[in-house]
Amino acid sequence: MNEILSKIKSIIIEKLGVDEKKVIPEASFINDLGADSLDSIELIMEFEKEFDIIISDDIAEKLITVDDANQYIKKYLDDKKSF
């Protein structure tokens, strides 16, 4: 497991109080992990803080699954390194 995904999983487990086994790449924050809209906002804020990134509201709405978050954060950090 890559470092980004590991940190994302830790944040989700801490914020949502779910079992680690449920936090798989295809798991939906709302449908599979039981997050509500406030939880989703808190997850986005934690991702921004942990990875020192900015996630716009438009992008946040598209981050539905664990893998969506992983792919976006990975791309953001890769793009950030190239500057």
Swiss-Prot record:
Pfam families per the UniProt record, alphabetical: PP-binding
SUPFAM superfamilies linked to this entry: ACP-like
A GO cellular component entry from the record: cytosol
The UniProt record lists the keyword Cytoplasm: yes
Pathway in which this enzyme or protein is active: Lipid metabolism; fatty acid biosynthesis
Keywords attached to this entry: Cytoplasm, Fatty acid biosynthesis, Fatty acid metabolism, Lipid biosynthesis, Lipid metabolism, Phosphopantetheine, Phosphoprotein
Compartments it resides in: Cytoplasm
GO MF entry, a single one: acyl binding
Record-annotated Carrier domain positions: 2-77
GO biological process, one term: lipid A biosynthetic process
Family membership noted in the UniProt record: Belongs to the acyl carrier protein (ACP) family.
Functional description taken from the UniProt entry: Carrier of the growing fatty acid chain in fatty acid biosynthesis.
Protein name: Acyl carrier protein
Organism this protein belongs to: Karelsulcia muelleri (strain GWSS)
Protein's gene: acpP
